[in-house]
Amino acid sequence: MKLLVLRLILIISTIFVLLNLSCMVNGLSLKRKSIVSDHWVNVANSIDGKTLTYNTIANKVDFLQFRVDREDESRILNDMYINVTSVKAARFGIFFNNFNPANSSNDSRGRAGYCPIWFATCGAETPYFSLGSNNSYTSDLTFTVTVRDEIKLCDF
């Protein structure tokens, strides 16, 4: 009987440790809005919650919509950089939440691709960004999303 109780305690404590470890990982994912429907499709993941990369081809008339999701809704992403590189010398406009273009008013560092801290209540804000092409040709694109820091908003 004692052996059975000890095994049960060991199993329960192992499950508890595994659940706590899974909560400590703040996964980061990049989702793209589907062209044919209004659904968001997961295109890239980052287990460490710091960096993810996604490659795609943009046609000359494409308007690409993305959102960055985090697994832990009690944290917000601070110092988030979105870098878009192109094989060709392409020009793209990056727009953040509510289709506001990245400019000096919402980009404290004065360059497109930097998202300042998102002020929000617990889990209420998800960074969205869109990419509009102003070129006449197709281009291969690489998206790199980097988060330097996280801020704990609240305890649930």
Curated annotation (Swiss-Prot):
GO cellular component terms attached to this protein's record: extracellular region
Residues making up the signal peptide according to the UniProt record: 1-27
Cysteines joined through disulfide linkages: none
Compartments reported by the entry: Secreted
Glycosylation sites noted in the Swiss-Prot or TrEMBL record: 20, 83, 103, 106, 134
Keywords for the protein's UniProt record, in alphabetical order: Glycoprotein, Secreted, Signal
Main location per the UniProt record: secreted
Keyword Secreted listed: yes
Protein's name in the database: Uncharacterized protein DDB_G0281771
